[in-house]
């Protein structure tokens, strides 16, 4: 690895990938952030190709998590359950943030992952008028699973990610907002949550393959911004 890839990042960053939002915390190495983004993107594309996310949400989620595992992530916790909500005004993003906060607290004993996810979500709402965001939105508004993830690198150089996926249907509006800002349209919904830690020894062996398969898609349908 080059010295450039080992530089420690100093800013929190959010990456919009194929309609899903990935937040990466400051303090990650540039290499770790790059690897996480590509793995997240690759797993999303594989799951999208294998299953209809709206009609086969459980299979889509399982495929996504299984691909992440095959790429070198260990999965100490994963679930996919029918949830209930008494409030239909809550956004998909708010539900996902709560799930990430709870799972992150259980894993790391703090609020850092939940706070990071919330910051990324809040920042996204302020860049709604960005032409690139709007273009990205139009391409991905029909997704059946809406994902939000937060990732950090600990002082021990462990890369930890929590992913929350919520089953949702796009509103039938031309100007609908990004999926994570959709409102729940029913009191029951399916939600998947997974805690992942990166085994860099394994990912080192597949990094080149992932990057080659992504090709130009590693920059297309991806929008990154500081938070």
Language-model features and meaning:
Residues 1-40, 44, 48-49, 61, ...:
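C-terminal assembly and membrane-engagement modules of membrane-active proteins
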Residues 45-52, 56-60, 65, 72:
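Long, solvent-exposed N-terminal ectodomains/accessory regions
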Residues 64, 68, 116-117:
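Short amphipathic alpha-helical coiled-coil/interface segments
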Residues 74-77:
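Short juxtamembrane and helix-loop transition motifs at transmembrane-helix boundaries
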Residues 79-134:
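Membrane-inserting effector segments that mediate pore formation, membrane fusion
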């Amino acid at each position: 690895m080059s010295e450039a890839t080992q530089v420690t990042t100093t800013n929190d960053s959010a990456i919009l990938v194929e309609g899903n939002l990935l937040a990466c915390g400051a303090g990650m190495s540039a290499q770790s952030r790059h690897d996480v983004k590509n793995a997240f993107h690759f797993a999303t594309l594989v799951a999208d190709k294998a299953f209809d996310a709206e009609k086969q949400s459980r299979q889509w989620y399982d495929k996504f998590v299984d691909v992440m595992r095959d790429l070198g992530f260990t999965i100490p916790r994963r679930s996919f359950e029918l949830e209930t909500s008494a409030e239909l005004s809550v956004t998909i993003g708010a539900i996902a943030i709560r799930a990430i906060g709870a799972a992150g607290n259980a894993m790391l004993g703090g609020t850092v992952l939940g706070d990071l996810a919330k910051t990324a979500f809040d920042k996204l709402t302020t860049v709604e008028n960005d032409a690139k965001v709007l273009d990205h939105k139009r391409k991905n508004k029909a997704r059946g699973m809406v994902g939000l993830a937060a990732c950090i690198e600990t002082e021990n150089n462990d890369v930890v990610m929590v992913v929350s996926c919520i089953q949702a249907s796009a509103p039938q509006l031309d100007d609908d907002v990004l999926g994570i800002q959709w409102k729940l349209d029913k009191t029951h919904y399916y939600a998947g949550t997974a805690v992942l830690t990166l085994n860099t020894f394994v990912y080192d062996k597949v990094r080149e393959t992932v990057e080659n398969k992504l090709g130009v898609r590693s920059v297309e349908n991806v929008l990154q911004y500081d938070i």
